[in-house]
Design a protein with these regions (language model features):
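Canonical positions in the second alpha-helix
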Residues: 18-19, 52-53, 86-87
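Short coil turns that delineate tetratricopeptide repeat
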Residues: 24, 57-58, 92
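Fe(II)/2-oxoglutarate oxygenase catalytic core
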Residues: 69, 73-75, 79-81, 85-271, ...
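A short beta-strand-loop-beta hairpin characteristic of the jelly-roll/cupin
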Residues: 299-317
């Protein structure tokens, strides 16, 4: 110890090496041996000593940082990443104390990991580009996987707030070409847009999407009773809204093409959903994962977006967005005019006819329990 403190690394290493076998109840001074070897420039001997020490003290911060630095010098980037990540994890544990001398080593580790992630990301993206799968749905999913691998994105899964049906694919968005019936609805977009515009011009029929009820606690939603997010109900609680439906015959006819659930007191459900400029629907989860939500854009100004899970898409006139609202999702209008979509729900396509019938019976039984639908859409 005295020789090491005096800067005589050679003497220190020689004397400490005599103690490698240790003694009963006294462990070998592997960390000191490693420090002496490192000062001598003998990285190989330092690594051996640190490996012995970390076997007994796997979360010793100083030893982890020393080993990481040795791996960097030795060109073993992946090993260095592992030791630096373990060290940073140990440093952030509750109650962890960090000696001042280790702080620069921790900062060096953070910088190394950031640079390493950048290099690794570029390598993976180049590999994906070389496969020719960089575009389209397959490419998007590969890039999402890379983002998860590199920690650039959080993992989102179905988290319905009321009812979870197991075994369904964890997909945030579905693609238009998966639904043959959708073309018939999209063909009616010009007529539906005219009907929605007429409803807006009449200033009647729209009401806040999230409403308070006198016999329930107020919803914990910042847009509660706020007309900036409004709904023009065409179907509500399984029944057509007569006055509104009569004003929108083309829309009502178009909805007949969709596989909308028919559940007493609950579905069909269909609305014009209006979002005014500057309005942001905060992240939230839907109640069920047995349905998909369809947005048929009727008025789709620039500056609007929908994030479902880790993926963000924009509305384009006439191009339906289909998504699983049991994933965390949010929407915003940063444009200069209102965004209006035709919103309705459909069965998940994976559900068999038998499962759909059973779920219909189950949801109706749930709603009969107190005579009130838990989810009206």
């Amino acid at each position: 110890m005295a020789a090491l403190r005096a800067g005589d690394a050679g003497t220190a290493f020689a004397r400490l090496s005599l103690l490698k076998e240790g003694a009963p109840g006294i462990p070998a001074p592997w960390l000191l041996i490693a420090q002496a070897a490192e000062r001598l420039g003998d990285d190989a001997e330092a690594e051996v000593a640190l490996a012995h020490y970390l076997k007994d003290e796997p979360r010793h911060l100083g030893a982890l940082l020393m080993m990481a630095a040795l791996k960097v010098r030795g060109g073993d980037e992946r090993a260095a990443q592992t030791f630096y990540r373990t060290a940073l994890g140990a440093a952030t544990q509750p109650g962890a104390t960090i000696a001042p001398v280790l702080v620069p080593m921790l900062r060096a580790g953070e910088a190394f990991l950031a640079a390493s992630t950048t290099r690794f990301s570029a390598h993976l993206e180049a590999a994906v580009d070389a496969t020719g799968l960089a575009d389209g749905v397959a490419g998007a999913r590969i890039r999402q996987a890379i983002d998860l691998l590199l920690g650039r994105s959080d993992l989102f899964v179905q988290q319905p707030s009321m009812f979870y049906f197991p075994g369904l694919a964890q997909r945030s968005f579905f693609e238009r070409d998966e639904f043959a019936w959708l073309a018939s609805i999209e063909a009616a977009v010009p007529a539906m847009r005219a009907e929605a515009s007429a409803a807006m011009a009449a200033h009647t029929g729209f009401e806040p999407y999230v409403r308070s009820s006198p016999d329930r606690p107020p919803p914990a939603n910042p847009l509660r009773d706020d007309p900036n997010w409004s709904a023009f109900h065409l179907w509500q609680g399984g029944l057509p809204v007569a006055d509104n439906a009569a004003r929108c015959p083309a829309t009502m006819a178009a909805l007949d093409h969709a596989p909308i659930p028919v559940i007493a007191g609950r579905s069909p459900m269909a609305i014009y959903s209006l979002l005014t400029p500057g309005t942001h629907i905060q992240p939230h989860h839907g109640l069920l994962n047995t349905r998909l939500i369809c947005h048929v854009p009727l008025i789709a100004p620039a500056g609007c977006g929908l994030r479902v899970g880790a993926e963000t898409r924009t509305w384009r006139p006439g191009e339906t967005l289909i998504f699983d609202d049991s994933f965390e999702h949010e929407a915003w209008n940063r444009g200069t005019e209102a965004r209006v979509v035709l919103l309705f729900e459909i069965w998940r396509p994976e559900l068999t006819a038998t499962e759909r019938a059973a779920l219909t019976d189950l949801f109706e039984a749930i709603d009969r329990y107190q005579g009130v639908a838990i989810d009206a859409g």
